[in-house]
Amino acid sequence: MQGSVTEFLKPRLVDIDAINPTRSKIVLEPLERGFGHTLGNALRRILLSSMPGCAVTEVEIDGVLHEYSAKEGVQEDIIEILLNLKGLAVTLEGKDEVFLTLAKSGVGPVTASDIQHDGDVTIANPDHVICNLTTNNSEISMRIRVERGRGYVPASSRLSSDDDERPIGRLLLDASFSPVERIAYSVESARVEQRTDLDKLIIDMETNGTLDPEEAIRRASTILAEQLDAFVDLRDVTEPEEKEEKPEFDPILLRPVDDLELTVRSANCLKAEQIQYIGDLVQRTEVELLKTPNLGKKSLTEIKDVLASRGLSLGMRLENWPPASLAE
C-alpha cells in the first residue's frame, strides 16, 4: 500500500452481516484516523432525522371524542391505541397520503392485518397489535390517515388556524417518518500493512421493515454526498440578478420632431416628408434634406444647430430603426 503521504485511504472492505431481515451490522474499513467518527456521526444523524418514509398522522375512532377517553370492551385506553398505531410500518406506492379503515368485533386482538387497504399500500408488520377486544360484543372501527414525509414531525407543528373547525374526534399523532428505528455506531482500530492508526466503522442498524438496512445506508450516503457537492466547487449558486436591459436607442431619438421647436416653415417641410421622429431626421443627409420642397439652406442650418445642441447630427446610422415600440 504505497502512495503519496497526502493521499487519503478509501475504504475497500464493506462487510454486511444480516442479523435478521430488519437488522444488520455494516463494517467499513480502512478509514483514515478520525474518519470513523466523522462519517459514523453524519450517517447516524441522517438516518434518524432525514430519511423519508410513511407514518400514521391522524385517526378517527368511532365513539371516541378525545385521546383521554376509554372505549368499552377494549383493553387498552385510547392513548395506548394511538401509540400502537404509531408503530405501523407502512409504505405507499405513487401516493403521498391515503385513508385506511379498520373494523372488527368479537373477542381477540386487533392487528395491522385487519386494516383494509388497496394494492398501493403495503403493511410490513401485519402481526402488529393495535388493541385487544375483551368481550363478544366488543367492536371497534376507525379511519386512519397515512402520509409520506421525512424525519420527525410533532402533531403541534401541523396545527393551523383551521383547527377550530376540525371535526371533534379527529386525533392528531406525532409522526416519525424515518424507517430507521435504532442505529448505533462504534469505531475500532484497523491495520493495513505497517499502518496501525486506521479506523474501522461498525454501524448496527434496525429498521421497521419497510426498508432493509443496506438500502437505508445507501440512501443516507446519497443524501450526504448530494449535500456536500456544493463544497466541491465553491461557487455562488444563487440565481444571478437580472441586469436591467439598456434601451436599444437613446430616448431622445424616440421623441417627435415637434420637440425640437423648429420654426413653422422647417417643421412643415419635415412633416411633408413624413419625418415624424428625431430618429427619422438624424438619418437624413444634408443633400436629402435640401431636396425637400421649400426647405432651403437657412432651414437646414437651423435643423443642424438644433440637433448639435442635443449632441446629434445629420447622417447618423441607426441599426434596427424604427424600433417595434414605434410601430402603429
UniProtKB/Swiss-Prot annotation:
Enzyme Commission identifier(s): 2.7.7.6
A UniProt-annotated Pfam family: RNA_pol_L
Stored SMART domains: RPOLD
Catalytic activity as recorded in UniProt: RNA(n) + a ribonucleoside 5'-triphosphate = RNA(n+1) + diphosphate
Enzyme superclass (EC): transferase
Region (Alpha C-terminal domain (alpha-CTD)): 249-328
Keyword Ribosomal protein: no
Gene Ontology MF term list: DNA binding; DNA-directed RNA polymerase activity; protein dimerization activity
Described purpose of this protein according to its UniProt entry: DNA-dependent RNA polymerase catalyzes the transcription of DNA into RNA using the four ribonucleoside triphosphates as substrates.
Record-stated family: Belongs to the RNA polymerase alpha chain family.
Protein name in UniProt: DNA-directed RNA polymerase subunit alpha
Lineage, highest ranks first: Bacteria, Pseudomonadati, Pseudomonadota, Gammaproteobacteria, Alteromonadales
Chain's gene name: rpoA
